[in-house]
From Swiss-Prot:
Keywords of the record: Chaperone, Nucleus
Organism name: Candida glabrata (strain ATCC 2001 / BCRC 20586 / JCM 3761 / NBRC 0622 / NRRL Y-65 / CBS 138)
Primary gene name: CHZ1
Composition bias type Low complexity, residue spans: 49-62, 125-135
Biased composition (Acidic residues): 80-90, 136-148
InterPro entries linked to this entry: Histone_chaperone_domain_CHZ
Protein name: Histone H2A.Z-specific chaperone CHZ1
Cellular component per GO, a single term: extracellular region
Length: 148
């Protein structure tokens, strides 16, 4: 047992230590940039290697009209989404709570519970006064001392 144990490294010998891991910043989607990328890719696809400048100019004019058509389609889609959200015909009036409090589906009779609470408070108040009838007088005497 006099043998010394060889300490093995935690990392394998042939493994590389990773450099700093950079976190990617989260960005919101920017659809304008996406539209620009799409139009550029369409230009590249529709732009064959032509020798004449007239054909190139005609292709550029076509891509402008196509982008106008795409913009019109996007506008129509956005307006359709707005119309779907504003549709009030689907609201079921039986689900609306008229009492003004959230009950998570449970119907509560607030008048009944208020009466029950008042009754329980009266019982506890009467029990406290019966237990110590002179206690209320002592409190009034203490108040008189502080009023001076």
């Amino acid at each position: 047992m006099s043998e010394e144990k060889e300490v093995k490294p935690v990392v394998a010998e042939n493994a590389e230590v990773p450099a700093k891991v950079e976190k990617k910043k989260r960005r919101r989607r920017n659809y304008d940039d996406y539209d620009a990328e799409v139009t550029e890719s369409e230009k590249k696809k529709s732009k064959p290697s032509e020798a004449s400048g007239k054909a190139g100019a005609a292709a550029a004019g076509d891509s402008d009209s196509e982008s106008d058509i795409d913009d019109a389609k996007l506008d129509r889609l956005e307006s359709n989404e707005d119309e779907e959200e504003d549709d009030l015909a689907e609201i079921d009036t039986s689900n609306i709570i008229t009492t003004g409090r959230r009950t998570r589906g449970k119907i509560i009779d607030y008048k009944k519970t208020a009466k029950e609470l008042d009754a329980s408070e009266q019982k506890t108040d009467s029990a406290a006064t019966e237990a110590a009838p002179g206690a209320a007088d002592d409190e009034e005497d203490d108040d008189a001392d502080f009023k001076e």
